[in-house]
Amino acid sequence: MIEKVLELGCGRKKRAGAIGVDILADSDADVVHDLDVFPYPFGNDEWDRILCFDVLEHVQHFVACVEEIWRIARPGATVEVSGPFMSSVNYFSDPTHRRAFTSRTFDYFIEGTPSFRYGYSRARFRLRACDFDRDQFPFRRGLHRFLLGWANRHKAQYEDRYAFLYPVYTVYFELEVIK
């Protein structure tokens, strides 16, 4: 069976084999749609993989967008998200960014985390992976490689104490849809 892949905010660099969605008509999008307009033009449980690379930081209604992603994803589907880390110069330099991310951004949707108890949403995910600067700088050497490795192994301590001393650029999530 062929995996159905949806790329939200594909811009002009849509991944091969994906159906692209973007707000801009002159993008590579197959579907032109504003991610802050609900519902999305897809059925329930339709997608096996949803890609959200550098797009969710631009939406106004983050929780509603995550709920829509959950609605249109099949049970067990993979959702990949990347966005600017809270101490990244890229977060602060782009006037269209509405939010930054930390390793705990999706905890509100993950059972067993302290933030889940607030009950913001019925959308549920399992965290498969969370990495700082994944694939961003594959040739980092020496001190940079050591510090990035340390930050990825000690996320809470890094975010609480050292994020502005040694800022990373992006945070990447791989989530599994739970229904």
Predicted regions and their residues:
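Conserved SAM-binding loop
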Residues: 2-88
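S-adenosyl-L-methionine-dependent methyltransferase catalytic module, highlighting the catalytic core
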Residues: 63-64, 68-70, 74, 78-179
